[in-house]
Amino acid sequence: MQFVNFFPLLALVVISLAGKATVEAATGLNPPVKLVWHYYKLTNTCDDAETYIRYQVEKFYKNDSSIAPKLLRLLYSDCMVNGCDGSILLQGPNSERTAPQNRGLGGFVIIDKIKQVLESRCPGVVSCADILNLATRDAVHMAGAPSYPVFTGRRDGGTLNADAVDLPSPSISVDESLAYFKSKGLDVLDMTTLLGAHSMGKTHCSYVVDRLYNFKNTGKPDPTMNTTLVSQLRYLCPPRTQKGQTDPLVYLNPDSGSSNRFTSSYYSRVLSHNAVLRVDQELLNNDDSKEITQEFASGFEDFRKSFALAMSRMGSINVLTGTAGEIRRDCRVTNANDGA
């Protein structure tokens, strides 16, 4: 696959997306139902919903810029498991957020706050699934990403099923990663682009220690990791944590660090073998993802445009519309269990 002549077309694709009123939404992104741009304004049900959401995100972001990577991970964890139906927001003993892969998820507080505000203004109208998509868009835009169009009209799912969480380990190979993304209707460009979200945020040392001390049971670090990075991470991540000790956190992109800025430095780090997670470094082991990585490392605007398209595609996976699902009154519980 050749991408050399593809990237100049991304701007046209994003512009055409912004100019359309609807987008197909489901597995493979080709279903019989549709999402609508500015759904709540178009249907005259909550004209200022997106304005309310943006205002709350701005308030939170000014106090804590880490909400950008937190919301990105939260949205990914929602959309990639049974689609973008807000089910990751549900609480309960068997909810998706209790799955091991979702340990350390954040961003719930801001979603709950936004929902409270919208319920006071437009009760029973704006779905939690749409709130999560719109809030994520606004937060990452504040961090430096493009403000891509978010098509709305999603409804909320009501299934609590931790066993359904099939999010892969961050230590998988590029072939395994690509197979997972393809199973969700996404492609190698989407995968390489969405992994660029690791340009900000943190990860637990437990996801990195195998690369630092005993890669593939060799008793040695991952030979693809820059030796300086190995030393830096070993200082922060012990080979094992004792009972009762917390699992330390390290930055996914030390170049961004606490600023949580959306940049293309992630791709430069991959090329120089300074990726923290194996799944990121593995991008060089596939011809297509390597070519895309090289392009994004040298062309930030190409990355920004591709990110806008990939987020729109991910946000359209297996959505509920029409009479399917419900509009939750409280994002943490289904209406049947709300007690209101």
Curated annotation (Swiss-Prot):
Reactions catalysed, semicolon-separated, are:
2 a phenolic donor + H2O2 = 2 a phenolic radical donor + 2 H2O
Q: Which N-terminal stretch is annotated as signal sequence?
A: 1-25
Q: Which residues bind Ca(2+) 2?
A: 199, 255, 258
> What positions does the entry give for heme b binding?
198
Residues given in the record as Ca(2+) 1 binding sites: 78, 81, 83, 85, 87
Entry keyword annotation includes RNA-binding: no
Supply the EC number(s). Answer: 1.11.1.7
Instruction: Just give the chief location class.
Output: secreted
Q: Which residues does the annotation say bind substrate?
A: 168
| UniProt cross-references to PROSITE patterns, sorted A to Z | PEROXIDASE_1, PEROXIDASE_4
Enumerate the UniProt keywords alphabetically: Calcium, Disulfide bond, Glycoprotein, Heme, Hydrogen peroxide, Iron, Metal-binding, Oxidoreductase, Peroxidase, Secreted, Signal
- Give the record's GO biological process terms: hydrogen peroxide catabolic process; response to oxidative stress
Family annotation (Pfam families): peroxidase
Q: Where in the cell is it found?
A: Secreted
The GO terms this record gives for MF are:
heme binding; lactoperoxidase activity; metal ion binding
Q: Which GO terms describe its cellular component?
A: extracellular region
User: Which residues bear sugar attachments?
Assistant: 63, 226
**PANTHER family cross-referenced by the UniProt entry:** PEROXIDASE (PTHR31517:SF84), PTHR31517
Anything else known: There are 73 peroxidase genes in A.thaliana.
Name the record gives this protein? Probable peroxidase 61
- Source taxonomy: Eukaryota, Viridiplantae, Streptophyta, Embryophyta, Tracheophyta
Q: Which gene encodes it?
A: PER61
